[in-house]
Structure formats: C-alpha cells, structure tokens
C-alpha cells in the first residue's frame, strides 16, 4: 500500500487534468441519477489511499430506483451551496467539504455552484448512498461542463469521491477491476452483459441511522489492526472471480453461497480488529438465523451485508412471495425492471 498524505490533493488534481480540457466553463444546469449498489464480492482495503485504489476487485448489483438524484446549477449567492434531501448543509460539514473538493477538480473559474442531492434510500446506513451520490454528481458534472467523457473515465473520476461510486454509473451487474498500474489508469468499473430478470434483492432494515464509524475509518482500522486481514485480499480476489463465473453460468446457488461467505469473511475480519469493529447488531444476527432456518427448509435465499447493520437478501423471483410474507419489513428490489 502506498503511504501518502490523505490530504494531498495534487495527485487527484493531476489525474483529473489528464482527462479534462484546460479551458472549462459551466455550459448549462444539469441533472443526473445513479443507482446505489450492493457488492456481491466486496472490496476492503486500498493499495493507494490518495488515488483510492482497491487491494482487490469487486462485483456488484445496482439497486434500480434506489439511488441518488443530483442537480447542479449556478448558486444565487457568492459561495457554494450543498443541499442534501432538501436541507442546506453547513459548508464546513464533512459531507459539504467532500462535495466542494470534488467540484474543484472540475471547475476553473471557481463559479459558485449549487448542488442538490436527493437520496431515495437512507443516508449513511450501510446502503452505499455515498456511492450513488458521487456517481450522480460525476454524471451531472459531465453534462454541466459538456465534457462527453466515456464511462470508463467517468468511473475513474468518480472513484475519488467514493470507491464504490465507480460501480454506480450503470444498472445491473458491474465489476470493478483493481488494476495493476501505479497511476490507477486501469482501475475502473465496467458493466457486465448479463441480464437476469428473475434476480431479486430485499433490504431488511435493522438500523437506518448514521453508522457509528464510517466505512473509510472502519476500513483503515481493519487494515491496520486485524490479524485476519493479511489473507483477505487474495481470498477476496478469488471470490470476485468465482462470483463472476457463477453469474455467467446463471448458477444462483453457487452465486448466493459465495456472496454470503464473502460478506461473513469480511465481517469476521473486521471483528478481529483491535479493538473489534462490529457493524452488525443483534437484530442483524436474528435475520441471518431466520434466513438460515428457511434455507434448511429448502428456500434458496442468501444474504450479504456491507459495512452496516442492514441485511440484504439475495433470491430469485420464485422465492419472492415467501420473502415478502416472512421478512415483512423487507423492501424487495427488482434490479432489471424497466424504470
């Protein structure tokens, strides 16, 4: 892993400059939408913190109309404005500072901008709202400045806002390759040409409030202190390859088992950190135990969990009625339904 200051903005700025024209001005107000995503094979740990490069590849499924709507237009005041879910945020807040820093990579004349984001899912609750938020912001900036960048470049740029944002530029299944180059130019996401209309996801809410520790802080703590982390990158890379193969084969049982094992291995690695890091709550384990009991009865349902307490169920349409009846607080998502 490359040890460099996390506040060193010169390196990301150079990466943006390589893809953006020297003369750049806001052409028009713009709006964009990006879906949130759930990783079926997860990344945890970075080989370069400044460039936001992962130690392992990952693969996700996007969440259709669960995501972020973002609008950008000139501000009516002399300074930037950042709005989230209808609330104007203090400019010194962590979220606003991240948005403004990202805007600064694009603009040249420092024209004050107003950014409005509305999430259709709980913010900071383990549902990757930062991923959809920065993906939508990247797409909106591409439109606002009339850049017409290809999606592989947009994916690389979105990475500087949130690693998982690289995967939220598309619907469906998306793979983010870790890349090998030191400059990160080969670390971007790509959509997989895999259509699976029967595929379902259900979000079982456990805690929809802010997490006690951000994913970024939790990741850094795990990498630095967990004795189990040394085996994670190689296993996670192998899991990503195997999940991809299971998808191509439409082998749902293998896909589900791999995704669940990958998530549990990640949480075990976090819980082995010193001091322990545990995002899961007692109700999370209750949901898992209910799911495992259902599987013993022949129901092909699997689980995955990101850095949060909520449990995501993976199943096919044949199990949808059972899931709705037995996990009655769950919200079922059909990723391949047309909007």
Regions found by a protein language model. Give the residues of each.
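Short Gly/Ser/Thr- and Asp/Glu-enriched loop/turn motifs at secondary-structure junctions
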Residues: 304-310
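Short, acidic Gly/Pro/Ser/Thr-rich loop/turn segments
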Residues: 39, 48, 77-79, 208-214, ...
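ATP-binding N-lobe of GHMP and related small-molecule kinases
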Residues: 2-125, 139-151, 334-339
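Catalytic-loop motifs flanking and including active-site residues across diverse enzymes
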Residues: 95, 133-134, 239, 283, ...
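Gly/Ser-rich oxyanion-binding loop with an adjacent helix/lid
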Residues: 6, 15, 108-194
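Residue-level signal for inorganic ion chemistry
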Residues: 70, 255, 306
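ATP-dependent small-molecule kinase catalytic core of the GHMP/sugar-kinase superfamily
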Residues: 153-281, 285-295, 299-301, 314-339
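Short beta-strand scaffold segments in enzyme catalytic cores
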Residues: 39-42, 61, 68-72, 165-168, ...
